[in-house]
Design a protein with these regions (language model features):
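Short, flexible turn/loop "capping" segments at secondary-structure junctions
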Residues: 1-7, 54-57
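Active-site-flanking beta-strand signature of metal-NTP-handling nucleotidyl enzymes
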Residues: 6-14, 62
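Beta-strand elements of well-folded, non-transmembrane domains
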Residues: 13-17, 69
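Short, surface-exposed ligand-recognition loops at beta-strand->loop->(often short) alpha-helix junctions
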Residues: 16-27
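An amphipathic, aromatic/His-enriched active-site/gating alpha helix that lines ligand/cofactor pockets
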Residues: 30-46, 56-57, 64-104, 111
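Short, solvent-exposed loop/turn elements at beta->coil junctions and helix N-caps
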Residues: 49-53
Length: 111
């Protein structure tokens, strides 16, 4: 985790089928770099796309964003809303159940 980050969002997306999960993954793989380039300008310090693999029979992806300030979080949310509007049809086809959390970093230990 970036030492400058003091806020983060961690979202888990659960899908009914592997095909839906793979569609969602492709959407982020195709658009994630361009989106992060925009978010960096707003104060987002990290974007991480993950596939959860240790839960047999489930299809899950998680997304982590870290921000350097509360204002960076707010500005990034506006950019994320614009991003999702542009790809809403694809996102709806993936039909994820979303569990979103907003976090304040309390302790961050690293090697």
């Amino acid at each position: 985790m970036d030492t400058k980050a003091n806020l983060m969002t961690y979202n888990t997306f659960t899908f009914k089928t592997e095909a839906q999960m793979l569609l969602f993954r492709r959407i982020w793989e195709d658009n994630g770099t361009a989106l992060f380039d925009k978010l960096k300008k707003k104060g987002c310090t990290r974007f991480c796309l993950n596939q959860i693999w240790n839960m047999k029979g489930t299809f899950k992806i998680s997304v982590l964003f870290e921000y350097d300030s509360p204002n960076a979080f707010k500005q990034s949310q506006i950019e994320l809303e614009n991003f999702t509007k542009n790809i809403m049809k694809e996102l709806q086809a993936a039909d994820p159940v979303i569990e979103a959390s907003r976090n304040i970093v309390l302790q961050d230990l690293k090697v």
